[in-house]
Amino acid sequence: RRDDKIFDETAVVGVQEFASRLQSGLVPNFARWADLTAGSEIPKENREEINNELDEVTDYVFEVIQNSNFAQEVHESFMDLAVGTGILACEEGDAINPVRFAAIPLPHVILDTGPDDSIDHVFRERKNIRFNQLEQLYPKAKFSPEINSMVQGAGDKTTTVLEIVCRNYQSPNVTANFHYAICMTTKSVIFKREMEGLGSNPFICFR
């Protein structure tokens, strides 16, 4: 047990209170805690019109967030932040749940920093993944004949998937990341994509 050295409730209550206060102060439930507005490069005479359009976009964004599992998962991430680093994964969903969030416990990942001391590599080990779940987890994955046979007929057999997100420094003028998924049973890459743009990293890491 990880809590066998805890002799009173001070730490447990303190972590819960820390996470609750942080959530209510930064990202309160059922509130619009951020706004999309025109930047300084937009001419002043066009800003009002653009801000009105962005206001509608902001409403839609927060409607999606509030109908997702963001509130629950960000609270767990803030609890991790109380004792170290919080990691929140944001992934594309489906028509019912357009966005899915997942709080990733720190023992499940390894973080590495780049030349500017920011986190630029995330290694996540996903254990006990059933082969017949791989298609749902990675819809755009390309399976080798060996893995495809396991996906179709492995039943409840499980594998470990290593996910890696790393910064692409060959594109210095744009924020770009590579995202890999490796099936550790065959040691082969089943999924690879390149993501560009600020916020393209699906792992949000904060300290």
Question: What do the predicted segments below correspond to?
Answer:
Residues V161-L162, C183:
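A detector of the onset of the first functional module/processed chain
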